[in-house]
């Protein structure tokens, strides 16, 4: 006869809450860093694009002459505000002694907001990239001449801002993936 004699097998002791929260805290730290990257890069996108101006004789190229560049700055400002708010909330959660995983409602709100802002930033960056492509290469069908040979400084700054905006998209997309993980993960069960 064995030690258990057909009786119910003993259950393993539940894992400590500190051990269960370690991956979540690590993900929260990654999310915090991604939000910080999104904040910094969004600031750079706005600063570089707003300074994309150049005058050549009587001609002038400015970022606010294009709706695509204005949209990029506006979406970057919204992403900046949202990412900064999420950074502050994540930092507060991380530093809190009574840290808990986010509620389902909070996880859904984060997931939806992250998705919306990621796609909005991607759309604005893509529209600005298309405009930059036309500015650099022109369009023979529309009979638009390339302007970057004349407005080199303007095109360089606009291009740098567009590259930075795609970096912001990557940070927002990764942050969105973490939000999705928090929302759709299966709770760990202790058996």
UniProtKB/Swiss-Prot annotation:
GO terms for cellular component: plasma membrane. Residues 47-68, 136-157 are extracellular. Pfam families: CASP_dom. It is found in: Cell membrane. The keyword Hydrolase does not apply. Glycans are attached at residue 137. Keywords: Cell membrane, Glycoprotein, Membrane, Transmembrane, Transmembrane helix. The chain crosses the membrane at residues 26-46, 69-89, 115-135, 158-178. It is a multi-pass membrane protein. Belongs to the Casparian strip membrane proteins (CASP) family. Homodimer and heterodimers. This is CASP-like protein 2U3.
């Amino acid at each position: 006869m064995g030690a258990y004699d057909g009786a119910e097998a003993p259950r393993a002791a539940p894992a400590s809450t500190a051990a269960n929260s370690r991956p979540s805290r690590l993900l929260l730290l990654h999310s915090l860093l991604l939000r910080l990257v999104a904040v910094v890069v969004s600031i750079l996108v706005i600063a570089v694009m707003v300074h994309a101006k150049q005058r050549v004789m009587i001609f002038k190229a400015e970022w606010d002459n294009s709706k695509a560049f204005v949209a990029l700055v506006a979406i970057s400002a919204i992403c900046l505000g949202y990412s900064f708010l999420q950074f502050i909330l994540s930092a507060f959660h991380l530093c809190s002694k009574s840290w808990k995983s986010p509620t389902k409602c909070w996880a859904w709100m984060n997931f939806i907001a992250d998705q919306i802002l990621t796609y909005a930033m991607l759309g604005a960056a893509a529209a600005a990239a298309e405009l930059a492509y036309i500015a650099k290469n022109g369009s023979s069908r529309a009979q638009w001449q390339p302007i970057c040979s004349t407005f080199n400084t303007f095109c360089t700054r606009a291009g740098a801002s567009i590259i930075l905006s795609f970096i912001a998209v990557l940070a927002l997309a990764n942050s969105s993936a973490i939000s999705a993980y928090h929302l759709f993960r299966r709770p760990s069960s202790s058996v």
